[in-house]
Swiss-Prot record:
Belongs to the purine/pyrimidine phosphoribosyltransferase family. PyrE subfamily. 5-phospho-alpha-D-ribose 1-diphosphate binds at residues 85, 89, 91, 111-119. SUPFAM superfamilies: PRTase-like. Pathway: Pyrimidine metabolism; UMP biosynthesis via de novo pathway; UMP from orotate: step 1/2. This is Orotate phosphoribosyltransferase. The gene is pyrE. GO terms for biological process: 'de novo' UMP biosynthetic process; pyrimidine nucleobase biosynthetic process. GO terms for molecular function: magnesium ion binding; orotate phosphoribosyltransferase activity. Its EC number is 2.4.2.10. Orotate binds at residues 115, 143. It comes from the Archaea. Its cofactor is Mg(2+). Keywords: Glycosyltransferase, Magnesium, Pyrimidine biosynthesis, Transferase.
Length: 193
């Protein structure tokens, strides 16, 4: 299944500016998985295997990348779902968290890709401000750029990942050229976490 990530442009090589402001020789776009039901089922199953080991009452997606995965996982596991906006609405209810009530409940946070951890830290803080208890965070891919450490340091919350970038790269090694592989390995070497 993993080779389909290249075919569908889920993993891209080049020079990319990330939402964190960092420049990267690779880009991960898990939104492309949403248009491929077979691959989507596989990705959901990978998340599910981690979630089955955790104790939680509610699944909360991080906007925007985590929302579709949180929604499908909530439906699949029979758990209520919510999502955290990047900032509160200025109209309507003005809520930061939409969906099921998090107050007094054990929450697992879902996102697609982890870089610096800023989005997940923001979501954890919002959930705690609303009275939720954060049991953990799960991402499909940890880019290995100190995000897990940043989250643990800032919030005490453990992050679980389906893949770490080096592991994904090793799985893709037979499908990419040596220059692409080396470029990513050299880039990741600068992150000492």
């Amino acid at each position: 299944m993993i080779e389909k990530f290249l075919e569908l442009g889920v993993v891209k090589f080049g020079i990319f500016r990330l939402s964190s402001g960092l420049e990267s020789p690779f880009y991960i776009d898990l939104r492309n998985v949403l248009g491929e039901p077979e691959l989507l089922r596989w990705v959901i199953e990978q998340y599910r295997e981690i979630l089955l080991r955790l104790k939680f009452d509610i699944i909360v997606g991080v906007a925007t990348g985590g929302i579709p995965y949180a929604s499908i996982l909530g439906y699949t596991l029979g758990k209520p779902i919510s999502y955290v906006r990047p900032e509160a609405k200025e109209h309507g209810t003005g809520r930061l968290i939409e969906g099921a009530e998090v107050s007094g409940r054990e929450v697992v946070v879902i996102d697609d890709v982890l870089t610096t951890g800023k989005s997940i830290i923001g979501a954890i803080n919002a959930i705690r401000s609303a009275g939720g208890i954060v049991a953990g965070a799960v991402v499909f891919l940890d880019r290995e750029q100190c995000g897990s450490r940043n989250i643990k340091t800032a919030t005490g919350v453990e992050v679980y990942s389906v893949y770490k970038m080096r592991g994904l790269l090793d799985r893709l090694k037979d499908y990419i050229d040596e220059e692409q592989y080396r470029s990513v390995i050299n880039y990741l070497a600068q992150w000492r976490c």
